[in-house]
Amino acid sequence: FLGLRTLTVINNAVKNVKKNYGISLDMQKIDYNDQKVLDSLGTGRTDGVFQLESGGMKGFMKELKPHSLEDVIAGISLYRPGPMDFIPQYIRGKNRPDTIHYDCPQLEPILKATHGCIVYQEQVMQIVQSLAGFTLGRSDLLRRAMSKKKLNVMEKERQAFVYGNEAEGVPGCIKNGIDEKIANKIYDEMIDFAQYAFNKSHAAAYAYVTYQTAFLKYYYPVEYMAALMTSVSTSLPRF
């Protein structure tokens, strides 16, 4: 698991804090919307912070300026091929909510938390359920087909999404009052996105580790960096 070494670093940093200050930190009970920690991410000075150490991520965090853990989760999800194309739109919507445009009213409750952008696989499932009347099972099958790039399945489901499938109990977008061109546009965006998308639970698990490392670095930099450097030194080749 990618974060396994980082979990060890966090555990050792907590031990260092206990040793140096007599403070018993419970990382599950820290404030996960501490503005000082979030502001530190927005500076781009994120060396040693899980998932945010690359030059590209540092630059993205400076643009994003996360104000909540939700922003961190979305940021980790967006910084990937495919979803990365939505980054300018996401940042614009975050900073200027008046610029957000929803292709149809049904999208607003699904995409409002992510500033009008599709960010998670779960949102694709919600869209096809809300706009076209897909069942939960059918929407999950479509999500899998998109992630595996099964073009024949995606094209078949496009017909059901836009025009419906009466025999299978799918009303479709047009029957639900959504324009045909708009429905096809939404479907195209879902295909482009879903090929590379994270599910939210996966991104959230990473973001929690990201935040914990940022919290420790901000409040206990000596103890955290000592734990981090020790973890690196033990993996270096011995001569």
Q: For the regions a protein language model found, what residue spans apply to each?
A:
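Noncatalytic, beta-rich nucleic-acid-contacting surfaces in large DNA/RNA-processing enzymes
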Residues: 1-239
